[in-house]
From Swiss-Prot:
A single GO BP: SOS response
Domain of life: Bacteria
Cysteine pairings via disulfide bonds: none
Keyword field: Cytoplasm, DNA damage, DNA excision, DNA repair, Excision nuclease, SOS response
Protein name, per record: UvrABC system protein C
Encoding gene per record: uvrC
Localization (cell): Cytoplasm
UniProt GO cellular component terms: cytoplasm; excinuclease repair complex
Length: 622
C-alpha cells in the first residue's frame, strides 16, 4: 500500500516539526513536491524565519508563490557560514536544477561578451557569445546589448594599445606586420615579458570596467613624469593614447550630470513569456556600458510589482557575483523595490569594501534615468517579439505547406561539399524555433571508399550521413530528435535518403523534404513533381535560410580539409615521411614554405626527425 504524501500546509504538526529543525543561520532552502521535484530554491540570512514566512497566516503572497506553496511536501536546507556563500550556492543550484518557480536567466546568445584570457601568459582580448567557465582566471565583461558599439570600442582600443592580435603566431622565427606598425608588442617572439604585457592588458580592462576616466588620470601622471625625465618619445606615445581614450569617452551616447558617483540603473519590460532587463553602467556622468539580460518567470504576464522586483534582484545577484570589486558602483538605482534589498546591499558593501546603496529613485533626475532604461528595455522586448513573430509565422506557414501535425520546433538541414569527389564532407545545421542553434551543428567526413577524387556520388554520400545521424535514434532524447529534416538537392538525393530511413524504420516518425537550388523547388517523398509554392512565402524562406546555412557550413569545412591536404601533398612525396612526422613538421614550422627554407640542423631539431631524415627532406627541396 502506498501512502499519499500530503502537501505540508495540510499537515500542521509535520510542518511545525520541520520548521523547528531548520536553524536560524545563513543558508539555502529547497522546496520539493510529491514527485521529489524541486519547486523552488531560495537563500536567507536566517533560514528558519524565511521558510516560516511562506506559511504564515495572512501573508500576502504573489500568485506564483501561492501556487508553489500548495504543492510543497518537503523542505530541505543547506547551512552556510556566510550570506555570500548562501548567495553563491543558491545561484549554482538554480542553474543546475532550473526550478519551475524560480526566476531563470536564459543563457542567451543574442548578447555578446568581451573576454580577456588571463589564464594565458599573453592574454587575448576578443568578443564571444559564449561564456566558457572552464578557466577560472579568464574574465568576461557583458553581456552587451549594442554589438556594433562593442566592436567599434574594441577596434579603437586595439589602435590605442599594442595588443596581441592573433590566437596563434603567423611565423615561427619572426614577428608579423602588426609588430612593424606598432599594433602588437611582439608577443609571438616574446619581445615583451608576460609581466609587462599584463600591465598593458590591465589598462585595457579598466576601460571595460567603466574606469576610463581613472585610466586617463593615470596616463596623464605618467606622461608628465616621462616629459620631466626628457623621454619625449614615450611622453608623445602616452599623449596619443590619452587622445584616443578621450575620443572614446566622447563617443558615449548619453551624458548625465557630471558628478563623480559611479552608479548602475536597472529596469525591465516584460510580456507573458519573457522579461527584457537592461542595466546601464554610468561612471562620472557617462554611460559606459549597456548590458542586457533575458529572464523567465511563471505567469509573467500578470506579474505584480513585487514579482518585477524579484526579477531585478535575480539579475543583480547574478551579475555582481562575476564582476570584480572595482566594478561595483556605489549607487544602484532600481525600477522596483527588491524583496531582499538589504541582503544584497550588505553583501555588495562587504565585497566592495565601501558602502553601496540600492534604492528606487524619487527625485526627478534619477527617476528620469530609470524611465530611460525602462524605455530601452521596452524597445528591446518589442524587437525580440517581432523576431519571434516572424519565426512563428514562418514555422506556421511551413507546417501548412508540408501538412505537418505541429509546428517544426527542431529542423535539421544537410548538404554535401566536394570538388569532383575529393575531400568530400557533409554538414548538419539545426534551427530551433526558426533560429540557428550552432551548438548542435555537426561536420561529417564521407567514409564511402567509392567517393574519391574523380568519383563523386552525392546520393550515396547523403544516404551515408543520414544513416550515421540516425544510427542510435531510439536512444536519443526527445529534444535531439528533429521534427523535420531538409536535404539540399532534388529528387535523387531525397530518394536515397528515403531508402535509408525506410530501412531504419524511422520514415514515419521524421518528416523529410528536399530543396532544389535552381528554382527553390520543394520535393516530398514519393512525389514526382515539386510542391507548388511561392519562393517569397515565409515557410519557403525559412527552408532557404536553412539550406544556405548548411551550404556555408559544408563549404567552409571542405575548404579547411582541402587546404590541409594541399599543405601535406608535397610532403607525401618524401620517402620515409609519414603522416605523423608531417604533422610534427607542420606544427613546428607552420607551413611547407618554411620547411623548404629550413636548414638540415633546424629540421633535425623537430621531435621524431633525425639527422638522416632531415637530410632527405632538405635534399628533396633543394
Amino acid at each position: 500500500m502506498i501512502t499519499q504524501i500530503l502537501p505540508i500546509i495540510k499537515d500542521s504538526e509535520r510542518l511545525e516539526n520541520r520548521l523547528k529543525e531548520i536553524p536560524q543561520t545563513p543558508g539555502v532552502y529547497l522546496m520539493r513536491d510529491r514527485s521529489d521535484r524541486i519547486l523552488y530554491i531560495g537563500k536567507s540570512k536566517k533560514l528558519r524565519n524565511r521558510v516560516r514566512s511562506y506559511f504564515r497566516d495572512g501573508k500576502n503572497h504573489t500568485h506564483r508563490i501561492s501556487l508553489m506553496i500548495q504543492q510543497i511536501v518537503e523542505i530541505e536546507f543547506i547551512v552556510t557560514d556566510t550570506e555570500a556563500e548562501a548567495l553563491a550556492l543558491e545561484a549554482n543550484l538554480v542553474k543546475q536544477h532550473q526550478p519551475y518557480f524560480n526566476v531563470l536567466l536564459k543563457d542567451d546568445k543574442k548578447y555578446p561578451y568581451l573576454c580577456i584570457t588571463w589564464s594565458e601568459d599573453y592574454p587575448r582580448i576578443f568578443i564571444t557569445r559564449k561564456r566558457r567557465l572552464g578557466k577560472a582566471k579568464d574574465r568576461y565583461y557583458g553581456p552587451y546589448v549594442d554589438t556594433r558599439l562593442l566592436r567599434n570600442t574594441l577596434h579603437l582600443v586595439k589602435r590605442i594599445f599594442p595588443l596581441r592580435q592573433r590566437p596563434k603566431p603567423l611565423f615561427k622565427d619572426r614577428s608579423c606586420l602588426n609588430y612593424d606598425i606598432g599594433r602588437c608588442p611582439g608577443v609571438c617572439q616574446e619581445l615583451i615579458t608576460p609581466e609587462e604585457y599584463h600591465k598593458i592588458v590591465q589598462r585595457v580592462a579598466m576601460i571595460f570596467q567603466g574606469r576610463t576616466g581613472e585610466l586617463i588620470d593615470i596616463l596623464n601622471t605618467q606622461m608628465e613624469k616621462e616629459a620631466e625625465a626628457l623621454n619625449f618619445e614615450k611622453a608623445a606615445f602616452i599623449r596619443d593614447q590619452i587622445r584616443g581614450l578621450n575620443s572614446l569617452n566622447a563617443d558615449q551616447k548619453v551624458s548625465l550630470p557630471d558628478d563623480r558617483v559611479s552608479r548602475d540603473a536597472i529596469a525591465l519590460a516584460g510580456n507573458h513569456q519573457i522579461a527584457c532587463v537592461q542595466l546601464f553602467q554610468i561612471r562620472a556622468g557617462k554611460l559606459v556600458g549597456r548590458l542586457g539580460f533575458i529572464a523567465e518567470i511563471p505567469d509573467l504576464g500578470t506579474a505584480e510589482n513585487q514579482e518585477l522586483g524579484v526579477i531585478l534582484q535575480r539579475v543583480l545577484e547574478s551579475h555582481y557575483q562575476i564582476v570584480e570589486s572595482v566594478e561595483i558602483p556605489t549607487e544602484i538605482i532600481v525600477q522596483n523595490e527588491l524583496p531582499e534589498s538589504n541582503f544584497l546591499q550588505n553583501w555588495l558593501t562587504e565585497k566592495k569594501g565601501k558602502k553601496v546603496e540600492i534604492f528606487v529613485p524619487q527625485r526627478q533626475g534619477k527617476a528620469e534615468l530609470i524611465e530611460m532604461v525602462k524605455k530601452n528595455a521596452e524597445y528591446e522586448l518589442l524587437r525580440l517579439a517581432k523576431m519571434s513573430d516572424r519565426n512563428n509565422e514562418a514555422m506556421t506557414d511551413l507546417a501548412e505547406i508540408l501538412d505537418l501535425p505541429e509546428l517544426p520546433h527542431r529542423i535539421e538541414g544537410y548538404d554535401i561539399s566536394h570538388i569532383q569527389g575529393s575531400d568530400a564532407v557533409a554538414s548538419r545545421v539545426v534551427f530551433i524555433d526558426g533560429l540557428p542553434a550552432k551548438q548542435h551543428y555537426r561536420h561529417y567526413k564521407i567514409k564511402n571508399p567509392e567517393v574519391r577524387s574523380g568519383h563523386s556520388d552525392d546520393f550515396a554520400s547523403m544516404a551515408e550521413v543520414i544513416g550515421r545521424r540516425f544510427r542510435d535514434y531510439e536512444k536519443q532524447t526527445t529534444t535531439d530528435k528533429p521534427d523535420l529534416i531538409m536535404i539540399d538537392g532534388g529528387k535523387g538525393q531525397l530518394s536515397a535518403v528515403v531508402a535509408v530511413m525506410e530501412e531504419m524504420n524511422i520514415l514515419e516518425e521524421v518528416r523529410v523534404v528536399s530543396l532544389a537550388k535552381q528554382r527553390e523547388e520543394i520535393f516530398l517523398p514519393g512525389e514526382s513533381e515539386p510542391l507548388r509554392t511561392d519562393a517569397e512565402q515565409p515557410g519557403v524562406q525559412l527552408l532557404r535560410r536553412l539550406r544556405d546555412e548548411a551550404h556555408r557550413f559544408a563549404v567552409s569545412f571542405h575548404r579547411d580539409r582541402r587546404s590541409q591536404r594541399m599543405k601535406r601533398s608535397r610532403l607525401d612525396e618524401i620517402p620515409g615521411l609519414g603522416q605523423h612526422r608531417q604533422k610534427l613538421l607542420l606544427g613546428h614550422f607552420h607551413s611547407v614554405d618554411y620547411i623548404r627554407m629550413a636548414t638540415v640542423e633546424q629540421l633535425a631539431e623537430v621531435s621524431g626527425v633525425g639527422p638522416k631524415l632531415a637530410q632527405q627532406i632538405y635534399d628533396y627541396f633543394h
